[in-house]
Design a protein with these regions (language model features):
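Surface-exposed, charge/polar-rich loops and edge strands
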Residues: 2-41, 45-172
């Protein structure tokens, strides 16, 4: 079986609740190789024998439970898949303001919610969905990222969100 490069996006990780060297060690204990963390927010890139995203997610979560004493919801995508996503620029048709933050929400499964898009709430717009990803943009406000409540209400908590810039850093 050939090795492939993957990215794991973990929900709820921040430097205060998970040290990156410990996270890296947990992924290595899961049998993944060439493991690197990207930024301090739960982004891990690694090599693994090709397998289903679901299998890799379960493997990573089990290793975190064993080595960190807790598991973070993990969503895996292949690096090839992320590069294709970046190349398509799903924001292009929407005339997104240069000041807006572009964000991608990765879903654990396929979306079950039927939404007429784009949806707007307090300056945040959910623009489009493609398979397991939702693309949004918002202008930062003092209220913070209000769209997160809308995304959770619509798609549940089996998801995690990253900025477009973070996805680009992870896919490099």
């Amino acid at each position: 079986m050939a090795m492939a490069r993957y990215a794991a996006f973990l929900r709820g990780v921040m430097p205060m609740n998970c040290k990156m060297p410990a996270l890296k060690a947990a992924f290595e204990a899961a049998g993944f190789t060439d493991v690197k963390t990207v930024l301090g927010s739960g982004n891990v890139v690694f090599d693994a024998r090709s397998g289903s995203e679901t299998m890799l997610q379960q493997q990573a979560e089990a290793a975190m439970q064993d080595h960190l004493g807790r598991a973070f919801l993990t969503i895996v995508r292949s690096i090839d898949q992320l590069r294709k996503l970046l190349a398509t620029d799903p924001y292009k048709p929407f005339k997104v303001s240069p000041k807006a933050k572009r964000i991608v929400t990765f879903l654990r499964g396929r979306p079950t919610a039927k939404l007429k898009l784009p949806v707007e709430l307090d300056g945040a717009r959910i623009l489009t969905m493609k398979q397991g990803e939702i693309f949004s943009a918002y202008l930062p406000t003092p209220k913070g990222p209000v769209f997160m409540a809308l995304i959770e209400k619509t798609f549940g908590k089996d998801q995690t969100t990253r900025t477009w810039d973070t996805v680009a850093k992870v896919a490099r």
